Structure formats: C-alpha cells, structure tokens
From Swiss-Prot:
HAMAP family: Ribosomal_bL35. The lineage of its organism: Bacteria, Pseudomonadati, Pseudomonadota, Alphaproteobacteria, Hyphomicrobiales. Keywords: Ribonucleoprotein, Ribosomal protein. Belongs to the bacterial ribosomal protein bL35 family. Pfam families: Ribosomal_L35p. InterPro entries: Ribosomal_bL35 (IPR001706), Ribosomal_bL35-like (IPR021137), Ribosomal_bL35_CS (IPR018265), Ribosomal_bL35_sf (IPR037229). It comes from Methylobacterium radiotolerans (strain ATCC 27329 / DSM 1819 / JCM 2831 / NBRC 15690 / NCIMB 10815 / 0-1). This is Large ribosomal subunit protein bL35. GO terms for biological process: translation. The keyword Cell inner membrane does not apply. GO terms for molecular function: structural constituent of ribosome.
Length: 67
C-alpha cells in the first residue's frame, strides 16, 4: 500500500514539535479587532498547542508522515 499524502492545508497550519505536540496559530485576528480589548488581542499572539485528542486526529489523518 502506498504512503498517504500529507494534506497541504494541514502542513501550512500545523507544526509538530520535537516532543510530538502539535502547534498552531490562534484564530480571531483577521478582522473586527476594533471591538476587542488590547488584552484580548495580546493574548491571541503567537502559537499554542492543540489538545491531545485533537492532536492525535491531526497527526493520524492530516499529517500521516509526521513523527
């Protein structure tokens, strides 16, 4: 059976860390920022890790060749 291809949308959105966690950029910063507080905007910066159950599904179905 041939190897499964990685979903191209997933490889742009997720990164696998050295310990196997899945990192992603937080949503909610594209538009409509005027109604959010500075604290809300600041807390959306950077990346965060997916929950373990969601990370398992991402690695299994969308990034099958990741470690």
């Amino acid at each position: 059976m041939p190897k499964l291809k990685t979903k191209s949308g997933a490889k742009k959105r997720f990164k696998i860390t050295g310990t196997g966690k899945v990192m992603y950029a937080q949503a909610g910063k594209r538009h409509g920022m005027i109604k959010r507080t500075t604290k809300q905007i600041r807390n959306l910066r950077g990346t965060t890790t997916l929950f373990e159950g969601d990370a398992a599904n991402v690695k299994k179905y969308f990034l099958p060749n990741a470690r």
